[in-house]
């Protein structure tokens, strides 16, 4: 970015775009830049809100703290992230907000980012409150990871409504509660936390959704008494597609377990984690169990077996 120019390098040449219509004051500097699923560029600034730009038609819009024109909590934006639903998550020096309709950013007359409202012992409050949100990452299951200035890491489901875990120096190996950057390896499920006192990695056991349902397997197998969970996943580096229906039956054909790989039932993305419990919540007996899988429209199926040894 120049003073009011956006520069793109592609195929060995530079292209310049005038973004003065977004009224940026770039003397404050930039904090983050991302591209969403519509190829819209979102630019976070350190004092002038967010600039949205799409080179298709040279469309541009500046988003500020003004109601109906962004509704940001503060003009100083530190972090941006786009998820699989094309929602834009924005971390500022005073809280977190999200644009749920990023696709309409250039057409909407009224466009306000919204905080995520959660219930804390029955009392509504904003997710992360007024924390400074330094970094935001999205994993392979569309779950969210938020790194803050003083509060460590908050890990939520895709909508942000349910907190899966909180990590701090008191309850985890992270060396500091000041999180500078979070990065996710979507292939392995590892999440890397960069703090002001060092870097640590966490194995989230989350996999991205696959494109098609092929050969699957379960591990560990056989499953012994000291194994707490069984993972059902695709072979050869593939993962289960979103919406896959998974049924586990005993040898008599009785349904023991059923779960779709969707938000609200499984948060591991393109694989299923079974805790060896049946639909009544009790641990299953020793024996052979058959796993039946079908994709969302039942056009693809697969099967495997699990041996339980208690």
Language-model features: locations:
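C-terminal tail/sorting-segment detector
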Residues: 288-310
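Short loop/turn microsegments at loop-to-beta-strand junctions
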Residues: 30, 133, 243-245, 272, ...
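Carboxylate-rich, polar loop motifs that coordinate divalent cations or form catalytic acidic clusters
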Residues: 1-216, 255
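Glycine-centered coil/turn sites that cap beta-strands in beta-rich domains
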Residues: 212-247, 259, 274, 297
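Terminal processing/anchoring signals of secreted or surface-associated proteins
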Residues: 205-207, 218-221, 253, 274, ...
């Amino acid at each position: 970015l120049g003073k009011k120019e956006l520069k793109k390098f592609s195929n060995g040449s530079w292209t310049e775009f005038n973004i003065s219509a977004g009224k940026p004051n770039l003397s404050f500097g930039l904090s983050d830049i991302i591209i969403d699923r519509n190829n819209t560029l979102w630019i976070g600034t350190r004092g002038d809100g967010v600039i949205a730009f799409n080179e298709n038609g040279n469309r541009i819009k500046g988003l500020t703290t003004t109601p109906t024109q962004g509704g940001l909590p503060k003009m100083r934006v530190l972090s941006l992230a786009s998820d699989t639903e094309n929602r834009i998550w924005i971390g500022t020096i005073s809280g977190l907000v999200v644009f749920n309709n990023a696709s309409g950013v250039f057409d909407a007359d009224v466009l306000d980012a919204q905080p995520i409202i959660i219930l804390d012992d029955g009392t509504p409050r904003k997710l992360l409150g007024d924390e400074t949100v330094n970094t935001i990452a999205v994993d392979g299951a569309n779950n969210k990871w938020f790194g803050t200035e003083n509060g460590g890491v908050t890990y939520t489901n895709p909508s942000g409504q349910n907190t899966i875990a909180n990590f701090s120096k008191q309850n985890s190996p992270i060396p500091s509660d000041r999180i500078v950057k979070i990065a996710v390896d979507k292939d392995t499920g590892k999440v890397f936390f960069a703090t002001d006192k060092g870097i640590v990695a966490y194995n989230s056991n989350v996999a991205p959704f696959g494109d098609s349902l092929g050969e699957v397997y379960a591990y560990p197998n056989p499953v012994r008494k000291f194994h707490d969970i069984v993972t059902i996943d695709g072979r050869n580096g593939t993962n289960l597609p979103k919406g896959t229906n998974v049924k586990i039956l005993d040898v008599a054909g009785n349904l023991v377990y059923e779960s779709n790989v969707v938000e609200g039932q499984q948060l591991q993305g393109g694989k299923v984690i079974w805790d060896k419990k049946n639909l009544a919540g009790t641990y299953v007996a020793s024996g052979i169990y058959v796993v039946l899988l079908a994709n969302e429209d039942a056009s693809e199926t697969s099967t495997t077996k699990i041996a339980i040894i208690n």
